[in-house]
Amino acid sequence: MLRTDLALEAKELWEKSAERTTQLEGVRAREQGNLTRVDILDDRGAKALGKPVGSYVTMELPSFDRDVRKAAEDLAQVLQDLTGLEEKDSVLVVGLGNRAVTPDALGPQTVDRVFLTRHLIRGLPDSFGSCRSVSGVAPGVLATTGVESLELVRGAAEHVKPHCILCVDALAAGSMDRLCRTVQLSDAGIAPGSGVGNCRAAFSKDSLSVPVYAIGVPTVVDGGSDRPMILTPRDIDEQIRYLSRVLAGGINLFLHPNFAYDDFTQFVPM
């Protein structure tokens, strides 16, 4: 069976299964333009799709050589609609993944481009006192740190006390068509590595005591063979660079709505 982190694909796979002749209960889906929203309403839907209860919004991206700004602006609006954050709610942005492995470096490279303000608000209140408090961390992976990412993020969250946590991670898709072309946003948290059979401790409200939102893009696809194999595009380095710019741009516009897109170039590499 193909593995996928995308709730939309999980729903499609369930509906296409020859064994499924009944209606999919506990799940609601609707489309609007380039957005598709899948709501897993209860335990029946969660069991059928193998995903936690919550909302999953997928946004289709244009070709990676298109305008980053437009994609970032669209993403910022989706984030606001999904989270409903108040103007002064503080946020901890977490870049999950292994920076040394290109298909898994989306999270760390995105955090590198996020405008972090917590230290600026404290150090330069006259200039940045009106900004939202945003902090960020890229906790690495268990194999290189010896510590679960969740444990490191929990320690950071206990110290900075954010209103919510926004996790960014590379995902796995079941279809080549969605590889590096679909952004999934969710209010149900995330279990890193689940799409490639290396599931780590889940980031959720239960484990971190604050709402956890997840945003990710599939950068690998299941090989679909008897051997454990995953595939990634030949130009994945360029794709990750583009995707991290889109995600960071959207996150920056969402967290700092009083800034224009070009304003962020003063502080971070956009």
Language-model features: where?
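A structural-propensity feature for long, helix-poor, extended segments
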Residues: 129-157, 161
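Conserved active-site and cofactor/substrate-binding residues in soluble primary-metabolism enzymes
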Residues: 54, 70, 74, 105, ...
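Short glycine-rich or small-residue beta-strand-to-loop segments that form or flank ligand, phosphate
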Residues: 58-62, 90-101, 136-140
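A structural signal for small-residue-enriched, beta-sheet-centric alpha/beta enzyme cores
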Residues: 137-138, 151, 167-270
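N-terminal amphipathic/basic leader segments beginning at the initiator methionine
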Residues: 1-53
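Gly/Ser/Thr-rich loops at beta-strand to alpha-helix junctions
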Residues: 96-104, 143, 170-174
